[in-house]
Structures are given as C-alpha cells and as structure tokens.
Amino acid sequence: MPADATSSSHARASWTPAEIGLAISSVLLITLVAFEELAATTIMPAVVASFDAAAWYPVASGAALATQLSATVVAGALADWKGPRLVLFGGMVLFAVGLVISAVAPTIIIFVVGRALQGLGGGLLVVPLYVLIGAVASPRHRPVFFAAFSLAWVLPSLVGPAIAGHVTEVWGWHYVFGVVPLFVVIAAVPVVYVLRTVPASEARKAVRLASLARDALLAGLGVVLLQLAGALASSLSQLGIFALGAALTAWALPRLLPRGTFRSRAGMPSAILARLCAMASQVGLAVMIPLVLQRVHSWSEASSAWWVT
C-alpha cells in the first residue's frame, strides 16, 4: 500500500480530542445514571426502614424511573429546539441536585422529591449525548460510541447492586446517593470542552413540544400517583388517588406510543408491547426481590444484592 494511502487511512481512523472527550463524559454519565437506577433498588428497603415509612416503598423505588421516562420523551424535542447544550447541562444539574437532596433528606417525602428530580435529570441528559455523537463523532467512530453506551448501561447492572449493598452495610445508604454528584462534576469537565468545539445550532421550531410535554407529564404523574396510593392511610384516599393515577396514565400513555400498541398490531406496535411486558416483569421483580429477601428472610443488603445482579 502506498505511504500516502496509509497515512490517509490512519488520519481517518485517529480520534480527535473532541471525540475522546465526548466518549469519556458520555460513558461516565450513562454509567452513573444506570448505577443510580439499579443500585437504589438494592438499598431501598434500608432507606424506607430508616424513615419508618414502609408504605412509601413503591413510590420511593419508582419515582425516579417514572420521571426519567417522562423527561426522555421531551428531551429530543428540547434538543432540537434549544440545542443539546442547554438540555445536557440542565439534565446534569437536576440529576446531581436530586441525588444531593436524596442523600440529606430528613423525611421520606423529601427523599422522594430528590428521587423524582434525579430521574428527571437522568432522562434529560442521556438524549443530548446521542445528538452530540452526530455532531462530533465521525461516521467511522459512531458504532464504537453506541457499543460503549450499551456497555455503560449493562455494566452497572453487574456490579452496581453489589457496590451499593456493601456501601450501605459499611457506611450507610446516604453515601450511595451523596458521592455520585462528585463524579457528575468530573464527567462535566470533558464535555465542556466538547461543547466549545460544536457550533451553535440554529433554533428550530418546537415541533409537538407542548403536546409531548403535556402527555409525558400526565403519564409520569399518573404512574407516580399509582405508586403513591399505597402510601396513604385511609382506604378512601387510596382508592381516589389510584383511580386518578389510572385515569391519567390511560389517557396519556396511548398518545405517546404508536397507534395499535395495546392491540398488538403487527409491526412496531407489537414489538413495543412485547418490550413493555418484558420491562414490567423485570422492573417488578427487581424491586420486590430485595424487599422479600431483606424483610422476610433477613438477608443483608450486600447478600441480597447478588441476587439482584
């Protein structure tokens, strides 16, 4: 092969500083979001026990996931409208602030508020990272980014619960939430450089942003109300909040999914329905197994973490 062809191939294969910075920041941020989503599952029985609020277990476990899914729906439209910079930094701030609030929360209600903010930030910060891949990474390197992102989602499920269980046993559950914001700050450093190299995008029309935000907010609120119903004292309050949550979810969710999803229409709708059913069973088991092992069988947080893994 001629020397000039070899050097040209090497130039195409080499990584730019912006690509390296984006890879470091994005992988670390996704790892942190996935870690907090999975690690909290293991230690949540200890958290609600410390507040003497066992009835709040469902909402404490699910608030972050509900708000994360709601934020993910609107993050793409927001990134198109305002650019990825604002959405990414807003997501990082909300994610870190939510973790700090959860770590220092004096009551279970404040803890749930922190969890909701954490999920909101996690949903906002992930989508702009995919947008930045298109702006920064060369087509040759984009598959590497997507493979690294997949690993960043999977790896915390293998080691996160065990780490969280051990930290909770040795130092307490507060550290599982309180230490992660420091890593968010570290992850923000390379991405600041990356965003300086990305030209400001032209503002686009906010296509369906208002309707997406409304439907996502109502769907997330409905799911949170379904979880909150079990924490209320009176049966009448439980029934009323459950009915309201079910009505909001039933109204908003079909508007966020392809038509025919709940009728299992052939093609994408049936594929999404299959994913919904699989995720529902997986999340339900992941939430309940630690509770059963720790409350019924008196397992420690570290021991039950291995079964979650």
Where are the regions a protein language model picked out?
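12-transmembrane solute porter fold
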Residues: 19-36, 40-42, 61-63, 70-74, ...
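Hydrophobic alpha-helix/TM-entry signal in multi-pass membrane transporters
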Residues: 19-26, 88, 95, 111, ...
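A residue-level signal for alpha-helical anchor/packing sites in multi-pass solute transporters
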Residues: 43-47, 131-132, 136, 194, ...
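Short, Lys/Arg-rich, polar N-terminal cytosolic tail immediately upstream
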Residues: 1-15
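Small-residue hotspots at the loop-to-helix junctions and early N-terminal turns
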Residues: 48, 52-59, 147, 301-309
